[in-house]
Amino acid sequence: MSESAPTPRRERVIVGMSGGVDSSVSALLLQQQGYQVEGLFMKNWDEDDGTEYCTAREDLADAQAVCDRIGIKLHTANFAAEYWDNVFEHFLAEYKAGRTPNPDILCNREIKFKAFLDYALMLGADLIATGHYVRRRDLDGRTELLKGLDPNKDQSYFLHAVGGEQIARSLFPVGELEKPEVRAIAEKHGLATAKKKDSTGICFIGERRFTDFLKQYLPAQPGDIETTEGKVIGRHSGLMYHTIGQRQGLGIGGLKEAGDDPWYVLGKDLQRNVLLVGQGNDHPLLFSRALLASRIYWVNPVELERPRRLRAKVRYRQSDQDCVLEKTADGYRAVFDEPQRAVTPGQSVVFYDGEVCLGGGVIETAEAWDFGGRP
């Protein structure tokens, strides 16, 4: 990185400062590139239940320390009402329906690249920036969303529902870097967040147990745990606490006739409030050949008059999977070349053409893989 004075630019950029190292380095890099840089810390959750779980205060202090260090102004904004209406209520509704949602995807679409973008433009910004590990490319009059260069940190999965017009107004400085480089830059420039641990999990839950958090908002409905043969072998405390492919926390044990293989969640019978389980990590009912997706968001319009061969992820960090995507009367159907394990309704499937993230949608149903005739 050159230490020479940057050429001043006229564009004013407001960086979403989370109090983490990625957004900190993003602000620094943009400043070095000559942009007029300011920061903005957004509060998306009201801490009515105390501060022991939520790190917002600490994060704000870290963001302020970084802004002071590099000499930029830090704005603050409260988007808690927008978050509740556009993200959290949907999150609760999905769990109530027995599905497993991903609120981070909706948060990016509705808060970071909508509420924050609108607020930044109101403040007079030309562009916003975030610390996401993605890239953008302007091509043929549209802006594409590309995977981040670091395959271990690529976050395009979480940004697939953000439109090209919003991507065009956004910069992603660390998307061109690998994580160790980002930390090295932060350390070299004495940023307070250089060694700060990456945040994990859902932001509004923090470090508390997920079941304890959910109980505050949704009443638990206990029911039976059944095998695929219909035998009741236990009780669950609520379908919403379980997800497809889950092994831990089922409380099944001591069944003499069952053998030693661990039990896994295979499905949920919502009408009967029954959790369906089976033994073995490779149980056939854990694998799907196809899925149906709805609520599709494309970064840019995608032509699907006929089936199209693409690659897809059905969860974050999964390697890209070959599939054929077609539009149907009920949504979009993706048929995979290889069996897909633990395809989970409520989670997102995201489609790629090479390094370009095209968009994705919410998984509605999965079709079981027919292992007949296969080795």
From Swiss-Prot:
Top-rank taxon, per record: Bacteria
Region (Interaction with target base in tRNA) residue spans: 102-104
Site label Interaction with tRNA, positions: 132, 347
Principal place of residence: cytoplasm
GO molecular function: ATP binding; tRNA binding; tRNA-uridine 2-sulfurtransferase activity
Positions of transmembrane segments: none
Keywords: ATP-binding, Cytoplasm, Disulfide bond, Nucleotide-binding, RNA-binding, Transferase, tRNA processing, tRNA-binding
Protein name: tRNA-specific 2-thiouridylase MnmA
Organism encoding this protein: Pseudomonas paraeruginosa (strain DSM 24068 / PA7) (Pseudomonas aeruginosa (strain PA7))
